[in-house]
Amino acid sequence: MALDILAMAPLYQAPAINRIGPKTDPSKRPADPLKPLVLSRTKLTTIEAKRIMSILDEAIYKVELVTLLSYVASNREDMEGMLGEDVMRAVREHEDLCQVLLENVRCLKEKERQLQEQKEAEEEGWLRDRLLSIELQKSSLSPLMQQIKDSTKNVLRLLLSNPQAARLLQMQTQGRSAEAQNFIDSLIELRGFLFEKLLTSPMEARDKAQFLQDISRQNSNNQQIIDTLEKELAERMKNRNAEVEKENFVIQELKNHLHQVLKFSENSLVRTKQEAEKQQKADFRASQARVAKIQQEILQLQSQFYNLVMENREAEQALRKKKYKVETEIENWIQKYDTEMGEKQEELEDLDAVHREEKISLEELRRRHKVLVGEFAQIREEREINSKKRMEAEQEMVRMVRAATLIQALWKGYLVRSLLRSKKKRGKGKAKDKEKGKQKGKEKGKGKK
């Protein structure tokens, strides 16, 4: 609606705009006229606004589910596995009640149609009895409609307690009628209007009001221009009236002729009036009978109202007892919860104390571990030094053994060489003697030959 007003605003400002020259400075252009209606926020900030929107969203969600109940009833085999037995049982009961209501309404319309057809031919007493039976049947529709309302609430309660089934049902949008979809679209549109209203801050509302006042002021200026134009029109109308007066003379002659025609029609009007009076008397008698019947119905409705009040009082007492019982159980559960939470808190404190002690002991063990690591590193360094010294000593011992062995070998070699040298000297003398003997033997052999 606000956008429509803004769309019409330039039409009201047309006379003033036409007076402005075509050349304007771009740097001096006015601000955006729609700026006061642009919302500065996109999200709700107050709890009350969020609650209002959540209530409306919940209502739309329930309407979406209720409008699909007829589709569920007509596709029971396909939907039974998706929604469950409890929901399908409630839907079948709801469908049975709706069928009973539709059958009663159809029968009631049929009786009213028959009564309308036979109203002129039958007697007045018989008509009263038929009308009384129809009214009684109409009064019996109210409890049935209440049962249908309760059944609808029961189906919604079961669907809301089973979110998965509700989501599956909500996806079956092809089963919704066009009228139901239009109703849901209207609710969604209402939600958009309400959301925009809740997003509007008091400052924005004042700006919008100021903006509308400016538009109203511009409208008043335009109205002054219109008044001026109307004055010009009035002057021209005076000139036109002079011409009209000339034509009025011709019209007056036609009226005289019409007056004569009306005189002839007065007789027929009198006859029609007499017939209307007769019909009025007949209608008055019928209305008296109808008033008596309505008074009887009022007495019956008053007795039904008293009975319903008594029944509702008994139901209210039962609900009050049930409410007191539920509140007592809730208090017991709260006390039990507080006791258990106290025990859990004590246990948590004990565990926290044990945790702190374990943490302190862990720090002590870490400190000792650092000391032991330092001692271990020192011992390992000492062992490495000792092993190096031992290896050096062993290597020195090996060198000494090798040197002693070498010295012994050299000494033994020297002794052997010296011994061999002495033996060679003695052997040379013996060899010379042997050679001399061999030569002599050879010479003797040659001489024998």
From Swiss-Prot:
Instruction: Provide GO CC annotations from the record.
Output: ciliary basal body; cytoplasm; motile cilium
The alphabetical list of record keywords is: Cell projection, Cilium, Coiled coil, Cytoplasm, Cytoskeleton, Flagellum
**Looking at the keywords, is Cytoplasm present?**
yes
- Which PROSITE patterns does this one have? IQ
User: Where does it localize?
Assistant: Cytoplasm, Cytoskeleton, Flagellum axoneme
**Which part of the chain is the IQ domain?**
400-429
**Which Pfam families does this entry report, sorted A to Z?**
IQ (PF00612)
Got any disulfides in this one, which pairs? Answer: none
Region ranges (Disordered): 422-449
InterPro entries noted in UniProt: DRC10, IQ_motif_EF-hand-BS
Coiled-coil blocks: 90-125
* Comp. bias (Basic and acidic residues): 430-449
Q: Which family does it belong to?
A: Belongs to the DRC10 family.
Q: How does it assemble?
A: Component of the nexin-dynein regulatory complex (N-DRC). Interacts with CFAP52.
Which PANTHER family does the UniProt entry name for this protein?
A: DYNEIN REGULATORY COMPLEX PROTEIN 10, IQ DOMAIN-CONTAINING PROTEIN D
Which purpose does this protein serve, as stated in its record?
Component of the nexin-dynein regulatory complex (N-DRC), a key regulator of ciliary/flagellar motility which maintains the alignment and integrity of the distal axoneme and regulates microtubule sliding in motile axonemes.
- What is this protein called in UniProt? Dynein regulatory complex protein 10
